[in-house]
Amino acid sequence: MSNPAQRVPPPTRLPGLITTPLSWLYSIGINHKNRRYDAGQGVARLNRPVISVGNLSTGGTGKTPMVHLVVRMLQELGHQPVIAMRGYGAKPGEKGDEQLEHEQAVAGVPIVAQPDRLAGLRSLFASVTGQSLDVVVLDDGFQHRKIARDLDMVLIDATRPPDRDALLPRGHLREPLRSLGRADLVILTHTEQLDQEEIGELVRRVSVYAPAPVLTARHIWSGVTQYTRQEHGWSAELIPLDAMASKRVYAASAIGNPQAFLAMARQHGLKVVHHHQLGDHAAFSESQAQAWGNAQTQPDSPPLLMTRKDWVKAEKLGSWGDGVRVIVPELSVEIEDVERLRIAIQSVCLSA
């Protein structure tokens, strides 16, 4: 495989003469903010243990399936968790793509989705329904330091090594590398795209900045669900992965790291003949749904491939047309030393 350091795509087309000083100004702001939080200013502690799942860079690290994994672990340990998130990309009065995905994946788990997560959680805990909730999972919580946490998990996309990256807007980093010193646990994601030598090298490089344990995780497809548009809605059919080999597909995405998504598709033998890419969290339009539907009226036309994060938004569009097929991978995360994560979670819940 190629060196993962070479896989970091350019985050911006703006010339370095513009982005370099902007990144420098950004670093001044983030360093000032972190110094205040390090001193405990503006940090509140809840009367429940808090587990944060976050990252060092902009989107695409795999936070959502990791949140689901943590929530299920907590449930297996007998806890009743609540997910707290900002609700990025959601219109007023509507649910965002990540909230909808959470609701499908971990049905019944309460979700606080608002910019002021602290106020939302306090309001929930003061209610009758919130009394039994005993642990908080912060989705994208590494930079949301207003809430003290008992376990700070930081995800790093192995295909975007942070020591080969730069601060926003010149690069993808939301914080400098030294911020990894706050992490209690670092998890390298998307390692299925690296060989063992590359993984070992990256673990060593990350460990220079992170005194915490560094685990590795693979994103896997357990199968795919094919949704077919019918007169009164969508029908769903679970299809085994081996049936997808050599299948031609169109792809559409509005996610943080679409290249990782496309790479996984190709690893499973799918032939991506076209990719329609939008910005992270962007909404799909009725005209786009109509165009994709019209394209599938042709003989032997390929189905559309989408992540579940995109599908929860797109399925509500009304212009698809009958007979349209959309393929959605069932994504999960495998952690190499998963017992270490389980012990960390259990320890936090017992001691908090």
Regions found by a protein language model. Name each.
Residues 222, 278-283, 322-352:
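Short, flexible loop segments at boundaries between secondary-structure elements
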Residues 1-51:
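Extreme N-terminal, non-catalytic leader segments
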Residues 303-309:
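Acidic beta-strand-to-loop metal/phosphate-binding motif
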Residues 79, 86-210, 216:
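Phosphate/Mg2+-binding loops and adjacent switch elements
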Residues 2-6, 161-302:
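C-terminal accessory "lid"/substrate-recognition subdomains
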Residues 70, 74-75, 102, 206, ...:
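Hydrophobic alpha-helical packing residues
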Residues 53, 112, 156, 217, ...:
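Hydrophobic residues at beta-strand termini and immediately following loops
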Residues 34-90, 192-193:
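Walker A (P-loop) phosphate-binding motif
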